[in-house]
Amino acid sequence: MSAAVWQDGEDIVLKLYIQPKASRDKIVGLHGEELKIAITAPPVDGKANAHLTKFLAKQFKIAKGLVHIEKGELGRHKQIRIESPVQIPAEVKAIL
């Protein structure tokens, strides 16, 4: 179990480092004690958070409402809770 990703009952909790304004959306891999995710949205008016939520929901095959930002609403370092994921992306499963 990594410090970046852990299971909490049925949920998965992710400690993330976000890279906004990237060329494409991608789960990059470990970045120190966090999982790095690159997203195309700019960090303006909550666009990056909305885009991140949508991207993670698609990756874990769940509704956007089941992705919760627990910490780091306004920063690049975030803690995200994924409720009852249907699928776990290979990049996440490798460090779980």
UniProtKB/Swiss-Prot annotation:
| Pfam families in UniProt | DUF167
Q: Which Gene3D superfamilies match?
A: YggU-like (3.30.1200.10)
InterPro entries per UniProt: DUF167, YggU-like_sf
SUPFAM superfamilies this protein is in? YggU-like
Protein family according to the UniProt entry? Belongs to the UPF0235 family.
Do you know which NCBIfam families this protein is assigned to? DUF167 family protein, PRK05090.1
Please identify the protein, giving its name as recorded. Answer: UPF0235 protein VP2619
Q: Which organism is it from?
A: Vibrio parahaemolyticus serotype O3:K6 (strain RIMD 2210633)
